[in-house]
Amino acid sequence: YNPLTWQDVITLTRIKDISSLDRALAFLHRAYSYVERTEYYKLIRLLVKERLDILPAEVDNIPKIIENKLLYFIKSLGYNEVLVYPNFLSYKEMVNIDKLISNQIVLPCQPRVETPDSKVLIATDFDQRFTYILSEKDILQNFIESVNLEGFFCNKKTPESWSYKIIQGEEKLDWSEDMENYYKNKI
C-alpha cells in the first residue's frame, strides 16, 4: 500500500487546509470538544463511505507507518541504542534500536525516543495525533528528506494546540450532536 500524505487527504476531502484537517482529527478522537461541521463531515465521509482503507491518525503513539523509518534514520546517524520512556515517567531505559525495529520491544504510549547524547528526541504527547522531532536544524532537514516527512518547524512560541480556533454559529458541531447524528446514521 502507498501511504497518503496529509496533502492527499486534504485534496480527497476538499478540507480547507492543514489546520482544519487537524481540528477535524482532534474532534474525531475527542481532543477538541467542537469542530467546524462541514470540515468534519468531509473527513468522516472519506473515512466511512469513500475510502474504507484509510486509517485516521494514530493518537498517543508514533505512527506505525513511520516508526521504523525514524528508527532506521537514527541508526544512520551512528546510534545503536536509544533511551525509551513514556512522557509520564522519569525512568529512561536504554534499548537496542534493532529490537524496536523487529518489535521484540514495543514503544510505550506517549513515547519518548531519545539518543543517549540528547541530540535527537522523538515524542508523541498524550491525546495528540502528531509526533514532534526535536534536534538541530540540519539533522531535522535530513530527517525530513530521508523519511519523507510532512509538517512544519516549531519553536518555543508554537502552541501545542496550534490549529485550535473558536467556532461559533451553525458551523459549530459539538460532541453531543455528533453522537446523536452517529446513532441516527445521518453522517
Task: Please provide the spans of the model-predicted regions.
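Residue-identity detector for threonine
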Residues: T5, T11-T13, T38, T115, ...
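Generic serine detector
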Residues: S19-S20, S33, S76, S90, ...
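Hydrophobic alpha-helical membrane-spanning segments
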Residues: L47-E50, P63-S76, D117-T124, Q141-S146, ...
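Alpha-helical oligomerization segments
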Residues: I122-I187
